[in-house]
C-alpha cells in the first residue's frame, strides 16, 4: 500500500509540475515511466496517457484534432477567391465525413485539379489548420510531393511499398490522419496502386481502420480543359458563379485518368475510389486584384494606392484564347507586390 501512495503522489507531481524547466527527453521519460507504473497497478492506461503525456505532446484526441468546420468555411471564404465550387464541396464533404465517422465505410478521397496559382494547395493548408490544433505542423498531416518524394521512375515499385507502409503506420497511429499528395501528375505511374485497398475497403488484414482518414490528390491535370469549358459556358451567357460541380466533374475525372503521372489509367479511378473530382477555376482580373490586395495587407500595407494596384495588375499575363483568365493565377504575385512596395 505504501508503494501505491508513492506512485500516486508521483503521478500528481507529473500532472502539476511546471515542465518548462525539464528537458523534453527527461519529461517524456518521466511521464512514460509514471504512466506505466500506474497502469501496472490497475489504472486505465488511456486515462493516464490523456492526463500526462497528452498534456504536452500531440495525441490523436479531440483536443489536438478539433475538426473545426466553422473555421474551415470562414477561412476558405476569406482567403480563396474565384473558387465557389471548391469552397462549397470541400466544406460540405469534410463536414459530412467528420459528422459520420462511425458510419463511414471508406476514407474521404478528393482530387483538386486546375492550373497553377489558383488555390489548390492553399485550400489543403486551410484544411490542415481547421482540422488540427497544430495545423501544418501536426504529426498527423502527411504530405508527399511528386517532384521531391518520388523522383526516380525506375524505383516506382520500391516507392509503392514504402508508401503503403507509411500510410498503414500513420493510420495505425491515428485513424484521423490527413494525406496530401501534391503534383500527382509528376509522380511515377502506378505508385498509388499500392494504397488502392486502403482507399476502398477501409480495413486491412491487420485491423487497421482507414475509414476515418482523408486523402487529397492535387494536380494540374485538366486545367486547360476546365478553362476552355468555363469560357464556353460564359460565352453562352452563363454566369461563372452559377456553375456547379456537375458541369466539370466528368471532365476532370477523364483528364486525370488520361494524364501522365501516378493516376494515369489508375485503378484508383477505375474502381471509383475518388469521391469528388473538384475543379479549380481559372482566375479573372477581379480575382487577381483581390489576391494583390490581400498580399499588400499581409506585408503591412492594407490600403495600397490605385497606382500600386495597377502596377502589379499590369504584370499579369492572360491566356491568348481566353483573354479574361490569368495564366498563372495568383502564383507570382508575392514578389511582384514586394517589388512595387519597395518603390517608395
Question: What spans do the regions from the language model cover?
Answer:
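Extended, charged/polar low-complexity intrinsically disordered regions
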Residues: 2-5, 11, 15-70
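Pre-Walker A (pre-P-loop) alpha-helix and adjacent loop at the N terminus of AAA/AAA+ ATPase modules
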Residues: 68-108
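Walker A/P-loop
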Residues: 106-139
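Short glycine-rich substrate-engagement loop in P-loop NTPases that contacts/grips substrate
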Residues: 138-174
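Conserved catalytic/switch belt of AAA+ P-loop NTPases
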Residues: 168-169, 190-216, 220-224, 231-240
Amino acid at each position: 500500500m505504501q508503494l501505491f501512495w508513492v506512485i500516486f503522489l508521483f503521478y500528481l507531481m507529473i500532472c502539476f509540475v511546471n515542465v518548462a524547466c525539464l528537458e523534453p527527453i527527461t519529461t517524456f521519460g518521466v511521464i512514460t515511466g509514471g504512466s506505466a507504473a500506474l497502469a501496472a497497478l490497475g489504472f486505465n492506461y488511456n486515462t493516464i496517457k490523456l492526463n500526462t503525456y497528452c498534456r504536452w505532446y500531440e495525441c490523436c484526441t479531440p483536443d489536438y484534432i478539433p475538426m473545426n468546420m466553422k473555421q474551415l468555411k470562414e477561412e476558405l471564404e476569406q482567403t480563396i477567391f474565384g473558387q465557389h465550387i471548391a469552397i462549397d464541396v470541400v466544406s460540405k464533404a469534410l463536414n459530412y465525413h467528420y459528422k459520420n465517422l462511425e458510419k463511414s465505410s471508406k476514407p474521404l478521397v478528393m482530387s483538386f485539379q486546375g492550373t497553377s496559382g489558383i488555390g489548390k494547395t492553399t485550400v489543403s493548408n486551410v484544411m490542415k489548420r481547421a482540422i488540427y490544433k497544430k495545423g501544418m505542423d501536426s504529426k498527423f498531416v502527411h504530405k508527399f510531393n511528386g517532384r521531391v518524394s518520388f523522383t526516380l521512375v525506375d524505383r516506382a515499385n520500391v516507392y509503392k511499398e514504402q508508401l503503403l507502409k507509411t500510410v498503414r503506420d500513420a493510420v495505425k497511429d491515428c485513424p484521423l490522419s490527413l494525406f496530401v499528395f501534391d503534383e500527382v501528375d509528376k509522380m511515377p505511374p502506378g505508385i498509388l496502386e499500392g494504397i488502392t485497398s486502403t482507399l476502398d475497403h477501409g480495413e486491412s488484414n491487420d485491423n487497421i481502420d482507414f475509414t476515418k482518414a482523408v486523402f487529397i490528390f492535387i494536380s494540374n491535370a485538366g486545367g486547360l480543359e476546365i478553362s476552355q469549358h468555363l469560357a464556353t459556358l460564359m460565352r453562352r451567357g452563363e454566369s461563372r458563379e452559377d456553375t456547379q460541380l456537375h458541369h466539370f466533374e466528368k471532365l476532370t475525372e477523364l483528364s486525370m485518368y488520361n494524364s501522365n503521372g501516378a493516376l494515369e489509367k489508375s485503378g484508383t479511378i477505375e474502381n471509383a475510389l475518388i469521391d469528388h473530382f473538384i475543379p479549380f477555376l481559372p482566375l479573372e482580373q477581379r480575382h487577381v486584384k483581390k489576391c494583390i490586395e490581400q498580399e499588400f495587407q499581409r506585408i503591412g500595407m492594407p490600403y495600397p494606392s490605385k497606382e500600386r494596384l495597377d502596377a502589379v495588375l499590369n504584370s499579369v499575363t492572360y491566356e491568348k484564347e481566353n483573354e479574361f483568365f490569368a495564366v498563372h493565377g495568383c502564383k507570382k504575385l508575392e514578389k511582384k507586390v514586394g517589388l512595387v512596395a519597395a518603390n517608395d
